[in-house]
């Protein structure tokens, strides 16, 4: 399998690339900092920005699957996720590449009822612009003719991969903690099994929400509000 990865140097992106290389996949990754990518003989780094259609097009070239893990940082415009996704879709439309996986968040679309009250408040206030951009991203993907899958994870942590998670569409599950490594594992399993075509599954766990997790989520929110990584 030949993957094009966008958002490759983020927490989930690095873990996905590491697991993909271990599975003997070829990876092409768009990045502004090649030093942040995992190393390997089967990874090709394309330097550039997802807002540059030519760089996006070069990344998609000679691949058969695209994984979009875009997020927003203080150095980027507030609509980078949706604008970048539009460029990705257009690049795929120009090539025989139709399989697209996109990582968004629980709390969007039909999964809005799965998040706890304090997350709903944050999404409607401090994270409103970010979630609106993610919602626009989902809309663009769903309107495309691609074989897309939108994956909505629970609260992301840096815990190790366990392989113990639950997933599905309209399942009885709430947005509990899940490691980025497990999300990466689920993304690759979805590709291998060619599952959830034109669907938006959630992926989460049955873990209890502990003080440490709440603190991690709170500090992450604070960093976003203060404009730091």
Predicted regions and their residues:
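N-terminal Rossmann-fold cofactor-binding loop
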Residues: 30-35, 49-50
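Mid/C-terminal beta-alpha module of Rossmann-like enzyme folds, strongest
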Residues: 9, 173-229
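Conserved beta-strand positions in the Rossmann-like core of class I SAM-dependent methyltransferases
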Residues: 4, 28, 149
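Non-catalytic, hydrophobic alpha-helical segments
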Residues: 12, 66, 137, 151, ...
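NAD(P)-cofactor binding segment of oxidoreductase domains
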Residues: 73-100, 132, 136
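N-terminal Rossmann NAD(P)H-binding glycine-rich loop of SDR-like oxidoreductase domains
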Residues: 3-23
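Conserved beta-loop-beta element that borders a ligand/cofactor-binding pocket
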Residues: 138-159
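Conserved Rossmann-fold cofactor-binding substructure of NAD(P)-dependent oxidoreductases
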Residues: 44-64
């Amino acid at each position: 399998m030949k993957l094009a990865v966008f958002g490759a140097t983020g927490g989930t992106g690095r873990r996905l690339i590491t697991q993909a290389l271990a599975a003997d996949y070829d990876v092409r990754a768009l990045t502004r900092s090649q030093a942040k990518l995992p190393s390997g003989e089967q990874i090709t780094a394309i330097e550039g920005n997802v807002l540059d259609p030519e760089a996006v097009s070069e990344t998609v070239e000679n691949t058969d699957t695209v994984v979009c893990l875009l997020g927003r940082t203080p150095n980027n415009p507030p609509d980078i996720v949706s604008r970048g996704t539009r460029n990705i879709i257009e690049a795929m439309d120009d090539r025989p590449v139709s399989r697209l996986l996109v990582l968004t968040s629980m709390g969007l679309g039909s999964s809005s009822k799965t998040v706890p009250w304090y997350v709903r408040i944050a999404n409607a206030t401090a994270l409103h612009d970010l979630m609106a951009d993610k919602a626009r991203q989902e809309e663009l993907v769903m309107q495309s003719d691609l074989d897309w899958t939108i994956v909505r994870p629970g609260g992301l942590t840096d815990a190790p991969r366990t392989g113990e998670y639950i997933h599905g569409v309209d399942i009885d599950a709430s947005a509990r903690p899940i490691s980025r490594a497990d999300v990466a594992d689920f993304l690759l399993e979805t590709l291998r099994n060619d599952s959830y075509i034109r669907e938006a599954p959630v992926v989460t766990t049955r873990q209890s929400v502990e003080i440490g997790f709440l603190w991690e989520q709170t500090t992450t929110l604070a960093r976003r509000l203060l404009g730091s990584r």
